[in-house]
Structures are given as structure tokens and as C-alpha cells.
Amino acid sequence: MAKTVEQIAKDLNLSVTTVRLVLGGKAEQYRISVKTQSRINEHVERFGYTLNHSARSLKLNKTETLGLIVPNISNVFFATLAEKLELRCRRSGYQLMISCTYNDVDYENKLVKALMARNVDGLFIVPSTLENQQHHLRQIQKPLVLLDRDFGFTDNALVESHNEAGGDELARNMLAESKTPLWFLVGDTALPSITDRLNGYLQALKAAGIHHREWVIEGPDNTPEGGYALMDSLIDSQGVPQAFIASSLPVLEGAIEALRTRTGTVPPHINIGTFDEHPMLGFLPNSVWSMQQDEDTWAEKAFELMQRAIDGEAVNETAKVDMKLVKRFRQ
């Protein structure tokens, strides 16, 4: 098993400094005897040599680790983003520690404290609330890149999708199919990304001469359970819809389950829109429009901002990543 400088010094009854100078090629400069050099080199040849990363980290105040805090990885977008970001960090020599908050605001703060105690070099965080975001900005003295949610009141580094433009493009394309009302099932407008998607949808309606929000059904939860409740309520009040948009894949999952429960199937005539992309959408019998987030660009942008902050630059940039419309038409 390879040995550290400290272990080599102990084995040979030499000082750590002497061993380090020999291994660093400075033996002649500091007049270390040929005999001592030979002892050290023979020992290394026999056992090998490895860096003591703990000691190196203390000396440099750098651990080459980064932290990522997301709501959960059952959400396809966050799972994919975590994977892409981990791979991007690895390419540059960093390990990424991934933690989930499950939207527990107190636990999120505990995770931040725990990762800071491990002396990570920087943190990527999807904040649960404005209060959490403000807490992190006050408490974290390391490079910080916020992800997905812009609660405002900060000029910190941030990466998010262009959700308003995505909502507008999605609604315009679905309205062009002339199936109305085009309902919007909205889970948790306290999340800035969801509010932006709703605003984009309303913008598309106005462009089509529709100046009301009567087709919007809101609920408090961005979850499958929340989506089920929204669709259940819509069917109770209006019947099975001709067309609808779900504000996220979790909301869509619940909405589809409600349709299956109430009608015994997913009626193929319904036009369905959603945010985020998943191959399983192709198995629906419906025409489906989805706004795909670009996780590869997200990972590149987030790491770029983090690296600049680690290098000492004051980074206050917001990177907005374009979304891509994916269409699946059924005859």
C-alpha cells in the first residue's frame, strides 16, 4: 500500500521536511546526503508514495469537493441535472456531494451547515423559499451558485431556464391546434419557475385575443398528488378537458392518474402540454407538447460560474438557458 510523506518519515526515522524535499527534487539544494536520498527513494520504490489529501487540504484550504442541494431526485429534471453536473465537476477534478431537502426548509439549512463543516469549496443550491435563499446568502462564505429559482433580492450567481419564454412558446403552439379551452394546471406558484411558466402562458393567451385567466387552475403542491387534485377538480367542474398544460412533470403524472381513475383510460383526443421531457411521454396515445430543459448547458453554465467564483471573481451573473419544444403528434 502506498505511503504518505508522514508515514515514510516515521518508517525511516527522518523529518517530514527532509522526506518532502527529497521527493520534491530539492535534495541537492538543501545538501541532503546521498545516503539519505537513497534510503528514501528505495523506500518509495518498494512501498509507493501517495499524497496526504487531508494535510494538503488544510494547507491549501481547498478540498476539491463541491456540494449540490436539490429538492429531490425523484424529479426527472433534478436527477438529470445532478448527473450532468457531477460529470462536469469530475472532468475538472472535483467531487460533487449531492443532498436532497425534500422541500424541508429547516433540513435545507442543516444540509448547508453540514456541507460547510466539511469545507466544500463551493455550493450549488436550489433554494426552497425566499427565506432560505436569504439565509444562504448571509451564512455561506464560500462560492455559491443558485439554481432554478430566482426569488429576487439578490445579485448572486444564478442559472435558470427561460421559463416565461418557454410557457409562451408552449401555449402558442397548442393554441394553434384550435382546441380550447386550453387549461393550465398550476402547482405551487410560490416557486418562481412555475410563476414564470404561468406568465408565459398568459402572454400567449393575450396574443391570441384571450384576456382572462379563467382557464387557470391553481393548487399549492408541485407534486403528483397536487396534479391529481387539480385534474379531479377540473373534471368535477368542467368535465374531461380537450386540452391542458401541466406546470411540471410531477403535476402531469398526477393529472394523468386522475384521468385514468375517472374515465378508465387517458382519452386520446386530449392535447397535452407539459414542462420537462421524458421518453415515457411517447407512450401516451395523445398528441403531446413538452418544453425540454437543457441540462447539459445548465451544468456547463453552473460550473463555469462556480469556477470563476472559486478563482476569486465577484460573480453576479444570471444565466438564462433556452428551452426546446418537443412535439409528438398523433393521428
Region annotations inferred by a language model:
Residues N61-R172, A176, L234-V240:
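Alpha-helical recognition/docking segments in bacterial nutrient-uptake
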Residues P71-A79, S99-D106, R149, V159-E169, ...:
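Hinge/beta->alpha junction and helix N-cap segments in small-molecule ligand-binding domains
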Residues V120-P127, W183-V186, I217, Q238-S248, ...:
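Periplasmic-binding protein-like
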